[in-house]
Curated annotation (Swiss-Prot):
Family membership: Belongs to the peptidase M50B family.
Phenotype for I145N: Cuts RseA without previous DegS cleavage
Effect of D244K: Cuts RseA without previous DegS cleavage
Impact noted for substituting I304A: No cleavage of RseA in vitro, cleavage of RseA in vivo
Protein name (Swiss-Prot/TrEMBL): Regulator of sigma-E protease RseP
Known EC number: 3.4.24.-
Species of the source: Escherichia coli (strain K12)
Major subcellular location class: membrane
One biological process term in Gene Ontology: positive regulation of DNA-templated transcription
Means of activity regulation: Inhibited by Zn(2+) chelator 1,10-phenanthroline.
Length: 450
């Protein structure tokens, strides 16, 4: 319950910030163009708070925080007294109206740059993209990428950490190949390797793009040595103690902790013959994992924690810049996100990315809660990502969105007169139906992931 409330609160904060930024873009440019703004509302429904300024603009925070709007004086909506007609939105030039409409998405992009600017000043912790293991018969194995290799760039774009690698790989969905620049860790002897992506079975909502290529990142080492044994657990009942090293399971040598975890998970209630080493002496024990529910079937659980050797400092990286360099890096990062968002939306249309990858408010709320819990340097990039997506989607030439309004203005500029009210009304209805269908699909995907 606490987790749900945290996710909800983080989601409401994120939504409130991004909607305010978007609507403020419309509001600010409208004021600069001499348009009278009658209401600036964050949310819909019953007003929880309201205030009116000296220019007559009413500011509102409403009950339902799922959107917002800026209401401008407009003769098409209501009669306007003659002395105020020059302040009406519909009486402004096509260029001014286009600027007002485009200002919302532009504000979202500027906010993303600002968020990344703050993050790069604070410092972004990351891990150098050094390969730990390569899965047999994988795409990475076929390209002869070896453990200990550092991934320096993807198609010429530098990748200082694993997050940068993932961002570039996601953009390669549907491509036939990509070129990765690699070098032995600690060396500048670079070479290019080509990955064949024609049979790359990667689904963004189900797996990590790096692991889908058969690459396991170099991370903290987990040894088959027990750090802690929970009281009254299956491990405690079997006689296991902190400091024990598990040597064999059912006669098979154990070299990786993950192998032991899988054996325990797959054998609830079944006996596992262990050979361990305790203070240099061999010892044989029988372990019977307890059963607990998980993903529709029973899984084994024994109540132990392994010894973890932290990642050495030379594998860690912190991206931190001064105020001016941070602006350059933040702008570049935002531009990369904008290109990725457009690319992914295009691939959704062409079918290279499946529609079940669409995410709705539940997935966004989970992301908000998770990143907020990790800290500000993770929450701000999340806000930047959603802000960029909000800006790009609003520019789609779909009636009811900013892009649809811009399309009507472009037609008006070309033909020398506005699109008829009848045509606009019909297009708004079609656009609303399409938007509701997309939102329904996104919600369906969200619930199917629960």
């Amino acid at each position: 319950m606490l987790s749900f409330l945290w996710d909800l609160a983080s989601f409401i904060v994120a939504l409130g910030v991004l909607i305010t930024v978007h609507e403020f873009g419309h509001f600010w440019v409208a004021r600069r163009c001499g348009v009278r703004v009658e209401r600036f509302s964050i949310g819909f429904g019953k007003a929880l708070w309201r205030r009116t300024d000296k220019l007559g603009t009413e500011y509102v925070i409403a009950l339902i925080p799922l959107g917002g709007y800026v209401k401008m004086l407009d003769e098409r909506a209501e009669p306007v007294v003659p002395e105020l007609r020059h302040h009406a939105f519909n009486n402004k030039s096509v260029g001014q109206r286009a600027a007002i409409i485009a200002a919302g998405p532009v504000a979202n992009f500027i906010f993303a740059i600002f968020a990344y600017w703050l993050v790069f000043i604070i410092g972004v912790p990351g891990v150098r993209p050094v390969v730990g293991e390569i899965a047999a018969n994988s795409i990475a194995a076929e390209a002869q990428i070896a453990p200990g290799t550092e991934l320096k760039a993807v198609d010429g774009i530098e990748t200082p950490d694993w997050d940068a690698v993932r961002l570039q790989l996601v953009d390669k969905i549907g491509d036939e190949s990509t070129t990765i620049t690699v070098a032995p860790f600690g060396s500048d002897q670079r070479r290019d390797v080509k990955l064949d992506l024609r049979h790359w079975a990667f689904e963004p909502d189900k797996e990590d793009p790096v692991s889908s290529l058969g690459i396991r990142p170099r991370g903290p080492q987990i040894e088959p040595v027990l750090e802690n044994v929970q009281p009254n657990s299956a491990a405690s009942k079997a006689g296991l103690q902190a400091g024990d090293r598990i040597v064999k399971v059912d006669g098979q040598p154990l070299t990786q902790w993950v192998t032991f975890v899988m054996l325990v998970r797959d054998n609830p209630g079944k006996s596992l013959a262990l050979e361990i080493e305790r203070q240099g002496s061999p010892l044989s024990l029988t372990l019977i994992p307890e059963s607990k529910p998980g993903n529709g079937k029973a899984i084994g659980f024994v109540g132990i924690e392994p010894k973890v050797i932290p990642l050495p400092d030379e594998y860690k990286v912190v991206r931190q810049y001064g105020p001016f360099n941070a602006i350059v890096e933040a702008t570049d990062k935002t531009w990369q996100l904008m290109k990725l968002t457009v690319s992914m939306l295009g691939k959704l249309i062409t079918g290279d990315v499946k529609l079940n990858n669409l995410s709705g408010p539940i997935s966004i709320a989970k992301g908000a809660g998770m990143t907020a819990e990790l800290g500000v340097v993770y929450y701000l990039p999340f806000l930047a990502l959603i802000s960029v997506n909000l800006g790009i989607i609003n520019l789609f030439p779909l009636p009811v969105l900013d892009g649809g309004h811009l399309l009507f203005l472009a037609i008006e500029k070309i033909k020398g007169g506005p699109v008829s009210e009848r045509v606009q009304d019909f297009c708004y209805r079609i656009g609303s139906i399409l938007l509701v269908l997309l939102m329904g699909l996104a919600l369906f995907n969200d619930f199917s992931r629960l």
